[in-house]
Amino acid sequence: MKKGGERYVNWGREALDLYEKNLNKVGKIEYRGEFPYTLLPTFHSTATAQITVTIDEEGNFLHGEQVPANDKFTIIPVTEKSGSRTSGKEAHPLCDNLRYLAGDYPLYVADDGSCFEIYMEQLKKWYESEFCHDKVRAIYYYLQKKSLMHDLIEQKVLKQNEDGTLAEKETIQGIDQSKAFVRFIVRSLSNPLTETVDECWRDKTLWEKYQQYQRSM
């Protein structure tokens, strides 16, 4: 048992050493053929996004668009439970499916709105913590308005039936539009481009704030 334990400790130490030696590669997306991959920041995973929503720092909606298939690879913060979510309702901390992010989702799709409540309760805790980030604040302000579905329909990102409900047969990248995964761009005028980037999935300062937040728990 002792030898097995030592092997496990040595393996863990070697893995940590290897990770630390490659910190400069964290978050850099590379390709094997047409398949993207990256060394992930801790407490993060990847998702394939179907919709990009652009807002400003005050949480005002600017633009929505469908994500091109060759740009869907997205780094997102996760919790231990949301990272292994299958059929449960565990919300991701920031980017997620429409039913989690859209407070007006039940106006267009048969849904009880519980996923939105779970998501917002979790996001509020990050927003109120000392590890909040400007992008987290902007997204929280925007989603409180409960207008995401309306905004995306106005931009013709989502399509409706004649009765105003969301069209069931419409897809984005082959995914039912009602199940689309959303990521955010927060347009910043207060920070030079050399310090940060507007895309949440590429912002190292946002990754670091989430890592600090998770470690504080």
Predicted regions and their residues:
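Conserved phosphate-interacting/catalytic interface
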Residues: 1-217
